[in-house]
Regions:
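Extended, regular secondary-structure scaffolds
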Residues: 18, 34-118
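Glycine-rich phosphate/ribose-binding loops and adjacent secondary-structure elements
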Residues: 208-210, 225-229
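Extended, well-ordered alpha-helical scaffold/bundle regions in very large, multi-domain proteins
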Residues: 228, 232-286
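Conserved short loop/turn motifs at secondary-structure junctions
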Residues: 13-18, 45-48, 216-222, 234
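Glycine-rich phosphate/pyrophosphate-binding loops
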Residues: 29-54, 242-262
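Short secondary-structure boundary/capping segments
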Residues: 46, 53-63, 148-151, 232-234, ...
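Single conserved hydrophobic/aromatic residue that forms the stacking wall/gate
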Residues: 1-8, 12
Length: 287
């Protein structure tokens, strides 16, 4: 026989963050499942999550918490739903025979966002929603050509780009590299999640103007707010809707909860970093 208590105690606790923001997100997911609302929670599958605390001579020491070292039985990898997320490069503008402007991102770096589903079980109602957390994988992987030429850093550049995105929650942003990584993390899971949601919608519906009647994106504090501009980018550039139609859809299917007015929670990004990492998204923000 299976002792559920014993089995559960053998599973290493996933350390994907804590605090009020994470607690509220967990409450949202628990309530949605218990009330029978179909919903996905979206985030990043951090390889180390929060740090593991050790005490030495009365002082705290933070060490990596490798919660995935023995695998995690309650997650399901879904490679069939992977999406490309692009960073950097430049935007090329062109005009078609009808005088319509088109925008294409060129010379970018990209990673593949691969979702892992975790079950969120409602209370006594046979409802199971999903926590969909995204892992980053290289699009091209190891470059044997660069390695054979002695350029070892370039050989693993794509692998490192992907790995760095999902290493830890809240990387130190007291320096430029840290700020860049945080912005990349936020855009990474937002872009992948919106691409997935729109793909699900289009599988069953043909008119994107009906999206606000079928779905809502709940932004939990400021960290995922680039979702507004990313949804506009996809609707305008990839689905070829007019700006006004895209804006009407976006304003009716995106919601936001603000948790605090503390300065560290109300994020600001240097224009140089935002424009360099997300050139097309920056254009939309400017517009």
């Amino acid at each position: 026989t299976l002792d559920r208590s014993s089995a559960a105690s053998d599973v290493y606790k996933r350390q994907l963050g804590n605090g009020g923001l994470g607690r509220l997100a967990a409450c949202f997911m628990d309530s949605l499942a218990t009330l029978g609302y179909p919903a996905y929670g979206c985030g990043i599958r951090y390889r180390y999550g929060m740090f593991k605390q050790q005490i030495s001579d009365g002082f705290q020491i933070e060490v990596p918490d490798n919660w995935l070292k023995d695998g995690y039985p309650f997650e399901l990898r879904r490679p069939e739903y992977c999406y490309e997320v692009k960073f950097g490069g430049y935007v090329q503008e062109s005009t078609d025979e009808n005088g319509e402007l088109h925008f294409e991102q060129k010379d970018y770096q990209s990673v593949l966002a691969v979702p892992y589903d975790m079950p969120i079980v409602g209370y006594d109602n046979n409802v199971v929603n999903s926590l969909m957390i995204w892992d980053a994988e290289p699009k091209n992987g190891f470059s044997l050509e660069s390695f054979d030429q002695g350029d070892y850093d370039k050989a693993v550049e794509q692998e490192n780009l992907a790995r760095n995105l999902v290493e830890v929650l809240y990387p130190n942003d007291n320096h430029v590299k840290g700020k860049e990584l945080r912005l990349k993390q936020q855009y990474f899971f937002v872009s992948a999640s919106i691409q997935r949601a729109l793909a699900r919608f289009k599988k069953h519906h043909s008119d994107l103007k009906d999206l606000p009647n079928k779905a809502v994106f709940q932004m939990n504090d400021t960290h995922p707010t680039v979702a507004v501009a990313e949804l506009m980018r996809i609707l305008v550039d990839e689905e070829h809707l007019s700006w006004d139609d895209a804006w009407d859809i976006t304003t009716r299917c995106v919601a936001y909860t603000n948790h605090t007015i503390m300065a560290e929670a109300l994020e600001k990004w240097p224009i140089e970093i935002f424009q360099r990492l997300l050139p097309r998204v920056y254009q939309i923000v400017e517009e």
